[in-house]
């Protein structure tokens, strides 16, 4: 029987519910249990795929092509599992599906209501998360804050699931804030008490409370929270602010959080607590010596969460070299051919990540040109690959008006063009080339030495692709197409062998990087950047 754990949050948003859920998932996985995890988002968008990065941050893509919340990236990196489309459920997706059923007549003319129709749809998606993965435990984070009107249907659904499945199969974890009042010199439990009171008013009694705090929680404070919130004293867990997110699983383990959950849900773990690998990772993070500076050239840099997985992947790639990665955030709208040398003078490597739209694209092209001409390690992802081919066509071949058809529909030289299967698609949401696809690596290339495999699989999110009409011209002038789809039709990787490191890919390798297992192309980029730094 699959067990279900629900993680809610109170007092304020951004408490770290996602990190708490991911950390618990890691602890249970290390005990030999099969874990999956999902996020309920109360917004009415069907998915974040068409949302502005300024609004939502990064869109994280799963193997099966779901466009999801960035928290799923935390889940995958912490627990070291690959999630699926059932791992992110939005209110928009739920309502959309219910309304489609109503239009089809599935409800036989009945009145469609939040209870039972919306709540039943939510519960169905809960169960699918477990069934699709054959998990022992499903951990579900409820987005928003307890009491928010948007999340009430989700709260009601997880209340009902306890009756549906039995109390022994369901557990509620509530995250709260314990604020420190500087003038009084003490921490206050009242916000936590009121948050739990609100949750209980909605029919849910938490089994475990995780308290976010700046300072150590005294036993008296734990006893007080346990008394007023009606839970066991041992079930009040402290989660202190930490220098590294990777400290959190160890914090929770020291307070026996995994043992409490295992006992409460009558789980049968295969192993005792095993955190040697995680402790080694944390020791590595805490012993980094020196830094490598990477210039990240993008147009959403004012909200760094827009590139969250890219930054995390860079950090992972620095660990084997015991180096901290310092990201220099460069707004591509401010980069020109005239100032690019000054802006990028101090960086050890240049990365142009994915993106959409014409705005600020010329600044990215200027940065790519600087990297190519000055032999600075360059790594392009998605749009970063597309613009690398545009820059090469313009400045090496001499096709001055070359561009991407996405960015300039009237260009006489569409180096990047719409995928054939995208020609007649009008909707924006969910219509990109999404998910895991194979890539064939050309023997003897830098890509070959990076991956050491003839075929790899990587996650994609794009609508435009390199135009093969220009392949011979670019190859004749020194660009190598080192990765393609197995049929050779779609370009997946390009490189310039005359440079020490100039590699770009159409896929998004950042979605498969892990802190204990850096993604190969990121690791190679960081190694090249380190060599460049040492050669200065």
From Swiss-Prot:
Record's GO cellular component terms: cytosol
Lineage summary: Bacteria, Bacillati, Bacillota, Bacilli, Bacillales
Subunit text: Homotetramer.
NCBIfam families: PRK05380.1, PyrG
Residues holding Mg(2+): 71, 141
Catalytically driven reaction(s): UTP + L-glutamine + ATP + H2O = CTP + L-glutamate + ADP + phosphate + 2 H(+); L-glutamine + H2O = L-glutamate + NH4(+); UTP + NH4(+) + ATP = CTP + ADP + phosphate + 2 H(+)
Note: CTPSs have evolved a hybrid strategy for distinguishing between UTP and CTP. The overlapping regions of the product feedback inhibitory and substrate sites recognize a common feature in both compounds, the triphosphate moiety. To differentiate isosteric substrate and product pyrimidine rings, an additional pocket far from the expected kinase/ligase catalytic site, specifically recognizes the cytosine and ribose portions of the product inhibitor.
Keywords: ATP-binding, Glutamine amidotransferase, Ligase, Magnesium, Metal-binding, Nucleotide-binding, Pyrimidine biosynthesis
Stated name of the protein: CTP synthase
Source organism per UniProt: Staphylococcus saprophyticus subsp. saprophyticus (strain ATCC 15305 / DSM 20229 / NCIMB 8711 / NCTC 7292 / S-41)
Reported regulation of activity: Allosterically activated by GTP, when glutamine is the substrate; GTP has no effect on the reaction when ammonia is the substrate. The allosteric effector GTP functions by stabilizing the protein conformation that binds the tetrahedral intermediate(s) formed during glutamine hydrolysis. Inhibited by the product CTP, via allosteric rather than competitive inhibition.
Region annotation (Amidoligase domain) ranges: 1-267
Binding site for UTP: 13, 188-193, 224
């Amino acid at each position: 029987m699959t067990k279900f754990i629900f993680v809610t949050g109170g007092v304020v948003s951004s408490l770290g519910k996602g990190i708490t859920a991911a950390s618990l998932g890691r602890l249970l996985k290390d005990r030999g249990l099969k874990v999956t995890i999902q996020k309920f988002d109360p917004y009415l968008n069907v998915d974040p795929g068409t949302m502005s990065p300024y609004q939502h941050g990064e869109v994280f893509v799963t193997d099966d092509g779901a466009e999801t919340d960035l928290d799923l990236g935390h889940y995958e990196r912490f627990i070291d599992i690959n999630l699926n489309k059932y791992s992110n459920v939005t209110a928009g997706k739920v309502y959309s599906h219910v309304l489609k059923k109503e239009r089809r007549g599935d409800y036989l003319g009945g009145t469609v209501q939040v209870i039972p129709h919306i709540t039943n749809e939510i519960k169905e998606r809960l169960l699918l998360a477990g069934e699709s993965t054959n998990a022992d435990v499903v951990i579900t984070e409820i987005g928003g804050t307890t009491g928010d009107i948007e999340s009430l249907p989700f709260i009601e659904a997880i209340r009902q699931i306890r009756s549906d499945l039995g109390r022994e199969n369901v557990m509620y974890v509530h995250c709260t804030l314990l604020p420190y009042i500087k003038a009084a010199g003490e921490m206050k439990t009242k916000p936590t008490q009121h948050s739990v009171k609100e949750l209980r008013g909605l029919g849910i009694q938490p089994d475990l409370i995780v308290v976010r705090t700046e300072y150590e929680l005294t036993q008296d404070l734990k006893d007080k929270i346990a008394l007023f919130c009606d839970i066991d004293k041992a079930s009040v867990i402290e989660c202190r602010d930490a220098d590294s997110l990777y400290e959190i699983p160890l914090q929770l383990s020291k307070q026996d959080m995994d043992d409490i959950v295992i006992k409460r849900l009558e789980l049968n773990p295969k192993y005792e607590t095993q955190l040697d690998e995680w402790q080694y990772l944390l020791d590595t993070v805490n012993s980094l010596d020196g830094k490598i500076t990477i210039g990240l050239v993008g147009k959403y840099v004012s909200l760094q969460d827009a590139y969250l997985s890219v930054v995390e992947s860079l950090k992972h790639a620095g660990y084997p070299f015991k180096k901290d990665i310092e990201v220099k955030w460069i707004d591509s709208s401010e980069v020109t051919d005239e100032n690019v040398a000054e802006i990028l003078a101090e960086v050890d490597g240049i990365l142009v990540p994915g993106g959409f739209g014409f705005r600020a694209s010329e600044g990215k092209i200027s940065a790519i040109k600087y990297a190519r001409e000055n032999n600075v390690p360059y790594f392009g992802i998605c749009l970063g690959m597309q613009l690398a081919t545009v820059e090469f066509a313009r400045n090496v071949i001499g096709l001055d008006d070359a561009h991407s058809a996405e960015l300039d529909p009237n260009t006489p030289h569409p180096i990047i063009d719409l995928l054939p299967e995208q020609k007649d698609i009008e909707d924006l949401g969910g219509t990109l080339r999404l998910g895991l696809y194979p890539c064939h690596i050309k023997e003897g290339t830098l890509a070959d030495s990076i991956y050491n495999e003839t075929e790899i699989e990587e996650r994609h999110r794009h609508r435009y692709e390199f135009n093969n009409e220009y392949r011979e011209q670019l190859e004749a002038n020194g660009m190598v197409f080192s990765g393609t789809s197995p049929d050779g039709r779609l370009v997946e990787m390009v490189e310039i062998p005359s440079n020490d490191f100039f590699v770009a890919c159409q896929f998004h390798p950042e979605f498969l990087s892990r802190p204990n297992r850096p993604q190969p192309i990121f690791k190679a980029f960081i190694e090249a950047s380190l060599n460049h730094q040492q050669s200065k």
